[in-house]
């Protein structure tokens, strides 16, 4: 047996590193959300699954954070349920008080309004008032979008993870809004490969895991508290399609991030050239790292107030597109006065507007964030 309790393990534990002779492991009191290589899952074309244990584990003690994991732990439990129920396999998980209890697949949704929304739209997952993460979504529900609006009056989004990170949910859109003046809470969420649209507004979120979000191309993060990192580098779509697609305001790549006081870094896909229809960053007082230099095409660019310590390096625009070929294609640019006062901004305007023939920037006065005002950079 191996005791790794209180060992400072972070988000992922990889069972492939364990020696073959290890049959018991204690992972309690660690912040582990992902349990890689615990089981091998093979999914057939008809959706049938074959699950195999990768290790001969007969004792597994888990931290509270394990409750969010479905892809590995739920399948491990389902595969070994008879052994767990019969007592030949010992699997426990800590509760919110740190007490280890026998593992089960029932999960709470504390907010009554969120529970009502989920029951109305994703009833297949419920067992009474609890979500049973071992249940499958039927064909009618597995592709439904998630859209929790202000009118739904949700203040605690905990429990939504059990749908969004469910391998049987194939929805492409996740939109969560909290009423202005309220602060919705969501400690951790991981989204999957089918998601293309992610909109979060007015939520306090500690950990947003986008490592599997390779289909993501529209992201809006508005009034988000606590979040330090926004990493969309795993997307194989954002900024990587043709100029005709990326220049289309309906389907082009889109990133809007403002009034996120704790956000320190934004990471784009690491590609030589990126194209997008819309990029807006405003009022990010903690921003340290955001590299836009590999963006070569933008339909609209909005830069609001950013910390003076942040080195603002503008995109190197070489591609311009307008579906109306009778109109000279440009990038529409909006900035705040503080942004305009930066040397890099004035150099950007000189390059693409004042010294360009034809001019490649066009002016629009309004910034989106209510805490910013657009500045007339053409005067």
Question: Where do the PLM segments sit?
Answer:
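Intrinsically disordered, low-complexity Ser/Thr- and acidic-rich flexible linkers and loops
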Residues: 43-51, 237-249
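Conserved hydrophobic position(s) of the canonical leucine-rich repeat
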Residues: 1, 10, 21-22, 57, ...
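Ankyrin-repeat and related helical/solenoid repeat scaffolds used for protein-protein interactions
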Residues: 5-64, 269-336
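Short, T/G/N/S-enriched strand-turn elements that build extracellular solenoid repeat scaffolds
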Residues: 12-17, 35-40, 71-72, 128-135, ...
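N-terminal capping/linker segments that flank leucine-rich repeat
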Residues: 31, 42-43, 47-49, 53-178, ...
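Right-handed parallel beta-helix
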Residues: 178-217, 222-223
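Conserved hydrophobic beta-strand positions in leucine-rich repeat
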Residues: 2-4, 23-27, 60, 144-147, ...
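Conserved "Asn-ladder"/turn position within leucine-rich repeats
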Residues: 7, 30, 65-66, 151-152, ...
């Amino acid at each position: 047996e191996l005791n790794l309790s209180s060992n400072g393990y972070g988000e992922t534990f990889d069972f492939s590193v364990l020696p073959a002779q290890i049959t018991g492991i204690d992972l309690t009191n660690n912040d582990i959300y992902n349990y890689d290589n615990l089981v091998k899952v093979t999914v057939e074309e008809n959706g049938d699954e074959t699950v195999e244990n990768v290790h001969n584990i007969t004792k597994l003690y888990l931290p509270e954070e394990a409750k969010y994991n479905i892809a590995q732990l739920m399948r491990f439990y389902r595969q070994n349920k008879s052994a767990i129920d019969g007592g030949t396999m010992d699997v426990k998980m800590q509760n919110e008080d740190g007490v280890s209890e026998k593992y089960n697949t029932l999960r709470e949704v504390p907010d009554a309004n969120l529970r009502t929304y989920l029951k109305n739209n994703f009833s297949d997952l419920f067992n009474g008032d609890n979500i049973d993460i071992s249940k499958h979504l039927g064909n009618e529900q597995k592709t439904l979008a998630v859209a929790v609006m202000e009118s739904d009056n949700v203040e605690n989004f905990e429990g939504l993870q059990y749908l969004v990170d469910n391998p049987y949910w194939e929805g492409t859109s996740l939109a969560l809004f909290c009423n202005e003046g309220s602060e919705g809470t969501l400690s951790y969420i991981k989204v999957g490969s089918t998601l293309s649209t992610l909109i979060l507004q007015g939520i306090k979120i500690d950990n947003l895991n986008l490592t599997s979000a390779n289909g993501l191309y529209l992201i809006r993060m508005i009034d988000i508290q606590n979040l330090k990192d926004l990493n969309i580098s795993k997307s194989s779509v954002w900024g990587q399609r043709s100029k005709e697609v990326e220049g289309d305001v309906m389907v082009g790549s889109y990133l809007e991030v403002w009034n996120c006081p704790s956000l320190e870094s934004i990471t784009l896909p690491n590609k030589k050239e990126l194209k997008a229809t819309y990029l807006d960053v405003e009022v990010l007082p903690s921003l340290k790292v955001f590299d836009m230099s590999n963006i070569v095409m933008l339909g609209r660019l909005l830069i609001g107030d950013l910390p003076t310590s942040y080195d603002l390096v503008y995109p190197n625009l070489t591609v311009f597109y307008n579906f109306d070929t009778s109109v000279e294609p440009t990038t529409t640019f909006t900035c705040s006065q503080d942004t305009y006062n930066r040397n890099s901004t004035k150099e950007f305007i000189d390059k693409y507007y004042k010294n360009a023939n034809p001019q490649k920037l066009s002016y629009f006065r309004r910034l989106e964030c209510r805490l910013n005002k657009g500045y007339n950079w053409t005067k």
